[in-house]
Amino acid sequence: MTRRLIVEPRGLASARLRILVPVLSVLAALVVGGLFLAITGENPLDVYGKMLDAAFGSANGVSNTLISATPLILTGVAAALAFKMLVWNIGGEGQFIMGAVFASGIAIWLGPGAPSWVAIPAVIVAGGVGGAVWASVAAVPRVYLGTNEIITTLMLNFIALSFMNFLIFGSSSPWRDPAVSTFPSGRPIPDTAKLPEFFKRLDIGIFIAIALAVAAWWLIGKTRWGFAVRVVGDSAATARYAGIRVSKKILVVFLLSGAAAGFAGALYVAGPVGALDPRSLDLGLGFTGIIVAALAGLHLLAVIPIAILMGALNNAGPALQSIGVPAATVTMLQGAILIFAVAGEFFIRHRIRLPRREPVSVEMPDGVEPA
Amino acid sequence: MNESQLILTMVAAVGLGTPLIFATVGEIITERAGILNLGVQGMMLIGAVTGFWATFQTGNLEFGVVIAMVCASALSAVHAFTSITLRVNQIVSGLALALFGSGLASFLGRAGSEPLVGHPSRAQFEPILTGGIADIPIVGPLLFGHDPLVYLSWLVAGAASYYLFRTKMGLSLRAVGEDPASAEAAGVHVSKVRYVHVLIGGALAGLGGAYFSLALTPTWQDDPIGAAGWIAIALVILASWRPWRAVFAAYLFGAAERIQFTLQTLGEPWSDIPSTLLAMLPFILAIVAMIVLTSGKRARFLGAPAALGIPYFREQR
């Protein structure tokens, strides 16, 4: 009889393991990506070297990496907040877009006359409201009718994208730039509504994103309300026994999750993009947020460094294209990272060991294995 | 709308609905085994690119279809491993598959010294059963003159329906999706059944993807399937996990996708409706149908497999 590996659930995983799993996930994804690169005739090491250089090799590279990371911190927070509560909000993409729509809308409505200390907070708040409103379209049916939110949030992504396209390509809405008639594009928001830049093109949005992530961590981890939320996430039945109003908690967290993605849209519009521009906003940043959250183990502070890593990857795409390697290499790597991170969950949840001694062998009838 | 435009819309809906039938029936089979695979979009794209590539190399359509099914099935094996063997979260694993598949398909279409992107297919599926019978009013163009894969999709839906509800293996499959512990007690190998049906689901998604690149739009482009893989996941619920209903649900969505082109041909005021708004129609339809079908007491009669998405721990029976 061979010695069988014993797989058993473990309680709390060590901090070392929690860091080891994401690191190994990234390395394993690089190996898989390297195989595909090698098959198609590229030298993986050259490609990865180029990516590293594009992301961190120069002041411009670092600045661009942090610009890309800014929205990912918040879409990562959006996914982590919801997933902690077993609310499967896959709609970060749509909530991000609606945040951008609301934020650019308020900036254009306020016009250049409003001072920055009014315009910038208004833009950010509007973004959060836009994201929360869009999340509510899925959250309210989920909480009051039991409608599966996976499908509704997914579908809402495509509706939001079409709506943004309608505002720019399909109508003469206030969002569309009237000065450009040949090819439709978004109307630039007033300079007073734009976030000040401080390092190359990097704006203060990165600090706002980090502050909001810390606030979310504090709210969930350090407050009485957050404790109740965590109880609901662990076991809805326990929460009900404890007198916690479960459906209200789920609704609020769902809306906060939407708001976080909406903030990301606002910071992206008021930061690097400067207009409601479908070509710059349809980048899958909401989906990448799910990768960020999963790789961070749904930890609201771990989201920050992981977002910077993913931002670096996103930022490397155009650099690859310039040397004739498809930019989709980045999406492929990100998908592979997520696959390995999910698989790694197994090792966080379970312990695998070899039995120390030969187990007492019991004669079993054919085909029946000892439990 | 006059009669001929109605017929044209319906014929176009059959074309646009066919890949959705394959993918939806595949996902129904997977979900009936209790495994939720949200990676349909990724599997379809892998099917689309590998099928196109294989036909591009050999000029052989059937070979392309087989390669598409094998490759998409291989991708679904990743999800089978994580969700059945490692028993991790199926939702995140499926999303990972969707992202990886999309990225890899786009990468393969653009990589190498002579990338596929922009090339027309070397062969494409042509209409069959044309001529006399296709000229019968109304019924003719709806039933005849389609490409062979349209008829294959009806066959697949019929076969899946028979398999699920009329065979012993189908019964075991449904038992595994409803109550794996009881199924195992009755002598069914739960993990094996789940693996097999995740792989079948992957193969059918790959076939659906190949329909885009070898029949519907036989040129390789970066984003050849739109949101078909995501819509297929919604269609599973609208079809209430029954293959035959998936056929009608898929055609309904095909028609919703087609309506923007139909309205263009009708002249004012219909042609004034912006296509960007009409593009929302299938997704709004899905949300409304979801809310109506799954809310309150109706949900119980819908027929969702009871163990869908729940990992099965043999040791903790």
Features from the language model and the residues they span:
Chain A
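Cytosolic-side transmembrane-helix boundaries in multi-pass membrane proteins
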Residues: 1-28, 34-38, 234, 241-248, ...
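Hydrophobic core segments of alpha-helical transmembrane domains in multi-pass membrane transport
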Residues: 22-37, 75-80, 100-106, 127-131, ...
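Helix-loop-helix "hairpin" substructures at the membrane interface of multi-pass membrane proteins
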Residues: 133, 199-276, 300-305, 371
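Transmembrane alpha-helical segments in multi-pass inner-membrane proteins
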Residues: 255, 261, 265-335
